[in-house]
C-alpha cells in the first residue's frame, strides 16, 4: 500500500476514534437497550406523546449506532481492499481510491454531527422565511429558498410540515413557516439564519435587467413540554379568516385560518394550511411558543454578552450570496465556502454549506 494511502487511513482512523469517543458508543448501546425495554412496555401508548418521544429517540439512536459501526467496518476493510486491488491492477486501485474518498466524506459528516451539542440542537426545526427588498423578485426568491430547504429535507428522508404560506399577489410568497422533522434538524439548519441575497436577470423585468433580491431566514427549535413556555390566554388575541392562495384567491369557504397576536410582545403568528380552525390554532400556538422561547433565549444571550463585554453575534447580516448572473456562484460570506453550481444548491444540495457553517460556528464559540 502506498505510504500516502497508509497515512490517509491512519488520519481517518484518528478522526473516527474521536467520533466514537464523543458519541460514547458503549453508552449509546446501553441507551438503546433501555429504550427498547421502554418500547416493549404494553402501557407505553397510554401516553401517546411520551410514546412518540421514546420511539423517535430509539429510532435515532439505532440509526446513529448503525452509521458509526458501518464506518468502522468500512475503514477496517480498507487495507484488505487495497491489498486485493494491487493484485488486480489500476482499475481496482481506482475503485479503492474512490471508496476511500467516499469514506472520508462520510466520516467528516459524522464528525460534524458530534459538534451539535447545543441545548436545543437535537430538536426539530421551525423555519420562517420572509421576503425582503426587491419587490416581486424578492417574493419569488423567498419561494425559491423555501423549495431549497424542502428539497434538502426530502433528499434526506426528513418530514416537512407547512404551517403557513402567505402568497404575494404577482408571484412568490411574502412569508412561509414550516417544520423540518428530524433529529438535529434545528442544530443543523440554525446556521442558515440570516439574510440570503440573490443576483440574477429578473424574469419579471421586460427589459431583462439584473435584479438584486433579499430574503430573511429564521430557524427556531420546536418547543417541547419540558420548556415550560406557558402562554396566558388573556395575552393572546385570536382572529380567524378565510385561507387564501396565490393572487389572494380564497381557497376555503369557512374561516379556518387563524392569526394569533401576543399582546405583551407584539408577536404575530398565522396558520392557514390545515383544513380546520382548531388544527390551525394548535399549529399557530406551537409557532408562537417557539418564538417566545427565542425571545427568552435572546434575553439570556444579551445578558451573557453584557457580562462578557462584547456586542454579541451578527446573525441578522447577509450570510450568503447566490449569483446567477453575470457569473454562477453561491458563496457563504462567513465561512468563504463556495460552489459554482447554483442550480444544484437551489435544488437542495446544501450539505457542504451546512457542514462548513457548523464548523465555523464551533470555532466562533470556542474563540468567544
Curated annotation (Swiss-Prot):
UniProt keyword annotations, A-Z: Cytoplasm, Methylation, Protein biosynthesis
Keyword Protein biosynthesis in annotation: yes
Any one Gene Ontology molecular-function term assigned to this protein's record: translation release factor activity, codon specific
SMART domains: PCRF (SM00937)
GO cellular component entries: cytoplasm
Predominant subcellular localization, coarse grouping: cytoplasm
Free-text function comment from the UniProt entry: Peptide chain release factor 2 directs the termination of translation in response to the peptide chain termination codons UGA and UAA.
Protein family: Belongs to the prokaryotic/mitochondrial release factor family.
HAMAP family xrefs: Rel_fac_2
Protein name in the entry: Peptide chain release factor 2
Source organism (scientific name): Rhodococcus jostii (strain RHA1)
Lineage: Bacteria, Bacillati, Actinomycetota, Actinomycetes, Mycobacteriales
Primary gene name: prfB
